[in-house]
Amino acid sequence: MNEVMVIKEGWLQKRGEYIKTWRPRYFLLKSDGSFIGYKEKPESTEHNVVLPPLNNFSVAECQLMKTERPRPNTFVIRCLQWTTVIERTFHVDTPEEREEWIIAIQTVANGLKNQVPEDEEEEAMEVKYGSPSDVSSAEQMDVAMSKGHPKVTMNDFDYLKLLGKGTFGKVILVREKATGRYYAMKILRKEVIIAKDEVAHTLTESRVLQNTKHPFLTALKYAFQTSDRLCFVMEYANGGELFFHLSRERVFTEDRARFYGAEIVSALEYLHSRNVVYRDIKLENLMLDKDGHVKITDFGLCKEGITDGATMRTFCGTPEYLAPEVLEDNDYGRAVDWWGLGVVMYEMMCGRLPFYNQDHERLFELILMEEIRFPRTLSPEAKSLLAGLLKKDPKQRLGGGPNDAQEVMSHRFFVSINWQDVTERKLTPPFKPQVTSEIDTRYFDDEFTAQSITLTPPDRYDNLDALESDQRPHFPQFSYSASIRE
């Protein structure tokens, strides 16, 4: 096992992802790809006896971009986290300093790429389910390759309805021609992930597919590429977004909220046990399947499409759901998911968001400072649960301790819940969607389902067989499929 070494260290200005101020951070770039930032220069890096970092992410398989806006000598690190594009923005004082950082980061990223053993690339492994993945846990993931399986292309599907669209791509309801099964296909434009003339950006299966299986997580069936797109084919839950149902009914009973909350907790416990933080719990990411059980989706597309004019950097994330530690640009762990659970359960039981203001600056202030308030109609157990989940300090938050999900599961609000029955889908859903078939999209937004499907340009459903792998160097390994058809 190679010893992890510090390759480069020094002060960088890091731009906040939500509150867009620049904050000085002392960063260490390590040989394992970790890129960690501190408020102060760590006193000692010997024996790794240092305070926990404020920022901690991986530069493995990242794309690097230089820009002179909004400040001179800025650089952006962009990578794909599961199927969502994320960016981090930094600036330094001189072009020479920026060049040093870029070369160091690129050298580390290239070194990691070369460490993938060839026999691992050849091996076909069974993957039943995929789930949102933390970029830093690539080594822990099982992979599935298309070798030994028929190649999947865009021609294998009928394109039925547009389910969502955003800055980086769109999600379409498709039918697999061979099986008649319905899926949601998330299509990302490569150009937003790789710029022309930039360093090759490789997507390996270990990054994208994780061998996870859970009843309340959306499964990934296939991933493949065309010359200009990346395509993720995911399980399709057609009972509608919880957001859709809640907006119709305004508020759910505590029993109904308890049912959905328990299924979300079960899924989060599963992800956390695999060192994956979901980070994006919000009503729009919670679907119901045809039986009325929860499915946590990964259709994230930066729906807002709000772009910062200076950097053309897209604002991703629904600000109402952001946890205080995310706003403060501190590194965040599993507790961020318990905050997200608190927000969605508050919405379900109270019929409104815990913190809201149209002005984002004011909203962020409320999230960071405002005390939570409850309607009089709420039971003491519900108030206690929500107050615990919505604690500002992640260390004090319910679920924020070492016992993680167990703290939430043992809260008295869930006293009537048999957690084994939850995971085995034995609880009767409080609402069964009125869908007549798998293709019934009555619970999806008319704004999308009424639109016709256009993939521009329409004639570029590439025949990938005509493209030799060396002609598409950016994504040489990007095609695989779950090896079992259910």
UniProtKB/Swiss-Prot annotation:
Residue ranges occupied by any Protein kinase domain in the UniProt entry: 157-414
Domain of life: Eukaryota
Record key words, sorted: ATP-binding, Glycoprotein, Kinase, Nucleotide-binding, Phosphoprotein, Serine/threonine-protein kinase, Transferase
Residue intervals of the AGC-kinase C-terminal domain: 415-486
Annotated positions of the Phosphothreonine modification: T314
SUPFAM superfamilies, per database record: PH domain-like, Protein kinase-like (PK-like)
Regions of compositional bias (Basic and acidic residues) in chain numbering: 459-473
Chain positions covered by the region annotation Disordered: 455-486
Transmembrane region(s): none
Family per similarity comment: Belongs to the protein kinase superfamily. AGC Ser/Thr protein kinase family. RAC subfamily.
Name of this protein: RAC-beta serine/threonine-protein kinase A
Organism field: Xenopus laevis (African clawed frog)
Gene that encodes the chain: akt2-a
